């Protein structure tokens, strides 16, 4: 049996018998697409997608069929069925890794847009699916970083434009376009992309100051770390309020993870200290029977919840935790830099 990479690298057009089997292959793919359009059972659809993934090398000569397969598979990926979503991303990744450049761009765009569409709401039921789709986006952006850079740059610029409008217009709609789950989830997704594919854990300095991979190639996505960091810093300043403590804590985590993985400084301390100094946290706590909100599933808390001792404890503990991690990294980075410079 051939390995997965051997299946991807296989070029059926180079076979002497290709002209004879080409109509059969084209008919097979077309009929499979028709079957996918008629199926309603998730298990059967998943099986068909898996068989298509095993035959993905035969899509290379047929650009129009590849577009149709990608479109249909993206619809399956966007569905709420977890098993179907797994089979769909396996096929999409195979298409992106096997077929010519335009196929990769379509697949990466489609997966990211499906994620962004599903990331609008966050609750206990959707959190796991959103996390899985985020991991899929990270995987897709790492297939070809040269092509992924342009797409990532465009999507990050969209986030920056929304932030700029919120800071300039100061309207309710502009504000809501930033302080919402879709915006925060997309920003967090790009932080994960950079951590996975441009981290200093994956790159080593060659003495010229340029970050290079183990095989000598230059990191392509790494320059995007700075705009992502600036967006996170700007988003935290849109509406400085203790009611949005869960959102700010989430942004602090993004900044700390990005700072640690890129080995760059981010001014986390002022944001954390400002959070600790909000006057609402110094008001006398009020006992309440209502359960404390889960900060991983909330972007803001109500005025009543903010007076709850449990909520105040979580805010203070989380702020100190992120502040401690920030200072620990700063001390480690200074020590490491001095040690490295004396070698």
For each feature predicted by the language model, list its residue ranges.
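Flexible loop/turn segments at the boundaries of HEAT repeats in alpha-solenoid HEAT proteins
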Residues: 57-66, 96-108, 141-152, 195-206, ...
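Core helices of alpha-solenoid repeat scaffolds
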Residues: 21-30, 45, 62-71, 85-88, ...
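Long, low-complexity, highly charged intrinsically disordered regions
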Residues: 1-34, 97, 105, 109-129, ...
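Conserved hydrophobic register position within alpha-solenoid helical repeats
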Residues: 45-52, 87-88, 133, 186, ...
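Eukaryotic scaffolding regions of large macromolecular assemblies
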Residues: 160-343
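Positions within ordered alpha-helical repeat solenoids
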Residues: 34, 38, 54-58, 75, ...
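Short coil/turn segments at helix-helix junctions and helix-capping linkers
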Residues: 16, 34-44, 60-61, 75-85, ...
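Alpha-solenoid helical repeat scaffolds
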Residues: 3-67, 217-230
């Amino acid at each position: 049996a051939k390995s997965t990479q051997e299946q991807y690298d296989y070029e059926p057009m180079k076979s002497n018998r290709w002209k004879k089997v080409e109509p059969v292959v084209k008919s097979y793919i077309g009929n499979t697409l028709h079957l996918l359009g008629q199926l309603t059972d998730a298990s059967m659809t998943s099986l068909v997608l898996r068989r298509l993934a095993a035959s993905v090398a035969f899509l290379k000569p047929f650009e129009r069929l590849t577009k149709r397969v990608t479109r249909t598979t993206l619809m399956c990926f966007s569905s709420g069925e977890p098993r179907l979503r797994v089979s769909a991303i396996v096929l999409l990744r195979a298409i992106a890794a096997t077929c010519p450049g335009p196929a990769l761009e379509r697949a990466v765009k489609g997966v990211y847009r499906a994620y962004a569409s599903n990331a609008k709401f966050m609750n206990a039921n959707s959190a796991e699916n959103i996390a899985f789709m985020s991991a899929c986006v990270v995987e897709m952006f790492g297939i070809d970083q040269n092509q992924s850079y342009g797409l990532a740059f465009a999507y990050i610029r969209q986030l920056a434009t929304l932030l700029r409008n919120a800071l300039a217009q100061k309207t309710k709609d502009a504000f809501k376009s930033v302080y919402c789950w879709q915006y925060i989830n997309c920003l967090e997704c790009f932080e994960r992309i950079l951590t996975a594919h441009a981290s200093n854990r994956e790159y080593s300095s060659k003495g010229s100051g340029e970050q290079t991979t183990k095989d000598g190639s230059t990191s392509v996505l790494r320059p995007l770390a700075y705009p992502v960091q600036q967006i996170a810093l700007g988003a935290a300043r849109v509406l400085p309020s203790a009611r949005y403590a869960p959102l700010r804590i989430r942004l602090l985590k993004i900044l700390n993870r990005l700072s640690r993985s890129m080995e760059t400084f981010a001014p986390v301390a002022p944001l954390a200290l400002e959070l600790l100094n909000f006057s609402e946290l110094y008001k006398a706590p009020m006992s309440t029977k209502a359960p404390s909100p889960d900060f991983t599933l909330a972007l803001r808390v109500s005025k009543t919840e903010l007076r709850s001792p449990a909520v105040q404890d979580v805010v203070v503990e989380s702020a100190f935790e992120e502040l401690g991690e920030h200072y620990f990294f700063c001390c480690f980075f200074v020590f490491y830099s001095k040690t490295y410079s004396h070698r």
